[in-house]
Design a protein with these regions (language model features):
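Short loop/turn segments immediately following the C-termini of beta-strands
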Residues: 53, 99-101, 145-147, 155, ...
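Asp-box/WD-like beta-propeller blade repeats and closely related beta-sheet repeat scaffolds
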Residues: 104-137, 143
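Short loop/turn segments that connect beta-strands within beta-propeller blades
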Residues: 62-66, 112-117, 154-158, 197-202, ...
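Blade-level signature of beta-propeller repeat domains, shared across WD40, Kelch, NHL, RCC1
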Residues: 274-311
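A short beta-strand motif characteristic of beta-propeller blades
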Residues: 24-30, 67-76, 117-123, 159-166, ...
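Beta-propeller blade signature
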Residues: 108-114, 246-253, 297-311
Length: 311
C-alpha cells in the first residue's frame, strides 16, 4: 500500500470512528411525562428497555437513539405498577414485574423481546410486590419486596415457587447472580447487602448480611458488568442527602465483607443500572417527587438514563 493510499485510508477510518463515537448517545430522555421509571434492561447491541412505574408503559430506545419512546402500552401489557425489567436475548424474552397495589396482586410477565407481543404471566403465590429479576440456567429469580421472599420460575414450570424467605428482613430489592455462583440481593429499607449460598440441590442455603466499608443507603438495582463485576445503585448514598446524591457503585466481595467503590455520584434518586459494553446506563427515578411533601405536585421535569463509562 502506498503512503498516499495509507494516508487516505487512515483518514477515512478516523472519520468513521469519530462519526461512530459522536453518534453514541450519553443521555437518553424518556419521551413522556411523570414517568418515574424504576428499572431498565438492555441487549448487547445497545437497545434499552425502560419501565415507567407510574405510566404503566415499557419504553424502548434503539441503538443511537436519544429518546426512549413507548413500545408496549399500558393497555397492551395490561400493566399497573411496572417495576423490574430484564431483557434476555438468548430466549428472545423481556421479563417485567407488574403490580396491582389495590388488589395486592403481583405478576411476573413475559413478552417477546423483538415484537413486544405477550407471552406468559405468572402470579405471585399469596400476593406480594414483584420488584426485580435475575436469570440463571434458564430459571428466573424474582424479589418480593413486601414479604422478604425470592421466588423462582424453573424452566418449563407454569408457576412460581418460594426459593428464599426471610420475613424478618423484608424490602428485598436488587438481585443478581455473581461469578462466584452465589446470589446477591439487598434491602432498600434496612440497607443490607446479602449473599445467599446455594445448596447442592439448587435450593437456597445460608444467607449472610455482608459488612461494607461504606454505609449503604437505599441500595437498589444490582447487575453484573459485561466483565462480571457487581454494579449497584444507591438512591441517595446517605440519610438526609440532597436530591442529586444518588450513586453508581462497584461492589467487591471479600469473604463476609464488601468494598464499595463509588464509580459516579450526583444522580437524582437513581433506581436502576444496566450494562452495554463498557458503559453502565444509570436510570434516574426521581421518586422524591412522589415521597417528599415539599416536592409532591411539582414538576419533576424530564427523566433520563445516563451513560457512565466503567473503568
Amino acid at each position: 500500500m502506498t503512503h498516499t493510499k495509507l494516508l487516505v485510508w487512515s483518514c477515512v477510518s478516523l472519520a468513521l470512528c469519530v462519526r461512530a463515537f459522536a453518534a453514541a448517545p450519553t443521555d437518553i430522555v424518556i419521551d413522556d411525562q411523570k414517568v418515574f421509571p424504576e428499572s431498565l434492561g438492555s441487549t448487547p447491541d445497545g437497545t434499552l428497555y425502560i419501565g415507567g412505574s407510574s405510566t404503566g408503559r415499557i419504553y424502548r430506545a434503539e441503538p443511537g437513539q436519544t429518546r426512549a419512546e413507548t413500545w408496549i402500552s399500558k393497555e397492551s401489557g395490561d400493566f399497573h405498577l411496572v417495576l423490574g425489567v430484564l431483557a434476555d436475548p438468548a430466549t428472545n424474552t423481556l421479563w417485567v414485574c407488574d403490580n396491582d397495589l389495590d388488589a395486592k396482586t403481583a405478576t411476573l410477565k413475559t413478552f417477546a423481546l423483538k415484537s413486544g407481543n405477550k407471552r406468559k404471566f405468572y402470579l405471585f403465590p399469596g400476593g406480594g410486590l414483584c420488584n426485580d429479576i435475575t436469570l440463571k440456567a434458564h430459571a428466573a429469580y424474582i424479589t418480593d419486596t413486601i414479604n422478604g421472599r425470592i421466588l423462582k420460575l424453573a424452566p418449563g414450570s407454569g408457576e412460581l415457587s418460594v426459593w428464599y424467605n426471610d420475613p424478618s428482613d423484608p424490602s428485598l430489592d436488587g438481585i443478581v447472580w455473581a461469578k462466584d455462583g452465589k446470589l446477591y440481593t439487598n434491602t432498600y429499607d434496612s440497607n443490607h447487602l446479602i449473599r445467599i449460598n446455594v445448596n447442592p440441590d439448587g435450593s437456597a442455603g445460608k444467607a449472610t448480611v455482608l459488612s461494607t466499608d461504606l454505609p449503604l443507603y437505599q441500595p437498589d438495582a444490582l447487575r453484573l458488568s459485561t466483565d462480571g463485576r457487581i454494579l449497584m445503585i444507591e438512591g441517595q448514598g446517605r440519610p438526609g442527602a440532597g436530591l442529586k446524591e444518588g450513586r453508581l457503585d462497584e461492589v467487591v466481595i471479600h469473604g463476609d465483607s464488601a468494598t464499595i467503590k463509588v464509580l459516579k455520584s450526583g444522580f437524582e434518586l437513581p433506581a436502576a443500572v444496566t450494562p452495554v459494553g463498557n458503559i453502565a446506563w444509570v436510570l434516574e427515578a426521581k421518586f422524591d417527587y412522589q415521597r417528599n411533601d415539599d416536592l409532591k405536585g411539582k414538576d419533576p421535569g424530564t427523566f433520563h438514563a445516563y451513560a457512565v463509562p466503567v473503568p
